[in-house]
């Protein structure tokens, strides 16, 4: 079933000019990039996006990291896009990620792991709506 999911190419990757290489991995996996924008997250945007982690000890560091430099927000489309992109990203800890995954190829650490991807269709819809209007998404 064709689905949409949300992706962020994080500051550790944009700082190293890896957007094109990451996009190539995404597209080689059969996902289409149907919307993409480079943005500098505000403190308020990052706090809202990561509010699920507000009580976690790493929350402040996460918000600071995500607002330090530009990110690339994306809408990806394809068969079983949520699950497929999570497989393409690899494990959160790059040491545990499978060969050929984005995190194995590009992540610097568990904290600077290069990409975010939605964990469910419901969250994908919520996350997409935070950054894109319907008319921004061109399938």
Curated annotation (Swiss-Prot):
It catalyses: a 2'-deoxyribonucleoside 5'-diphosphate + ATP = a 2'-deoxyribonucleoside 5'-triphosphate + ADP; a ribonucleoside 5'-diphosphate + ATP = a ribonucleoside 5'-triphosphate + ADP. InterPro entries: NDK-like_dom, NDK-like_dom_sf, Nucleoside_diP_kinase, Nucleoside_diP_kinase_AS. The active site is at residue 116. It comes from the Bacteria. SMART domains: NDK. ATP binds at residues 10, 58, 86, 92, 103, 113. Its EC number is 2.7.4.6. Homotetramer. Major role in the synthesis of nucleoside triphosphates other than ATP. The ATP gamma phosphate is transferred to the NDP beta phosphate via a ping-pong mechanism, using a phosphorylated active-site intermediate. Belongs to the NDK family. This is Nucleoside diphosphate kinase.
């Amino acid at each position: 079933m064709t689905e949409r999911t949300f992706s962020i190419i994080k500051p550790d990757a944009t700082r190293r000019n890896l957007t094109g290489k990451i996009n190539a991995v995404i597209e080689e996996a059969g996902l289409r990039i149907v919307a993409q924008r480079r943005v500098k997250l505000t403190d308020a945007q990052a706090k809202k996006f990561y509010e699920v982690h507000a009580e976690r000890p790493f929350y402040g560091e996460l918000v600071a990291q995500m607002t330090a430099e530009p990110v690339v927000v994306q809408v990806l489309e394809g068969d079983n896009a949520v699950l497929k992109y999570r497989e393409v990203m690899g494990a959160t800890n790059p040491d545990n990620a499978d060969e050929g995954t984005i995190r194995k190829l590009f992540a610097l650490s568990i904290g600077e792991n290069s990409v975010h991807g939605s964990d469910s269709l419901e969250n994908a819809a919520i996350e997409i709506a935070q950054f894109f209007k319907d008319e921004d998404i061109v399938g």
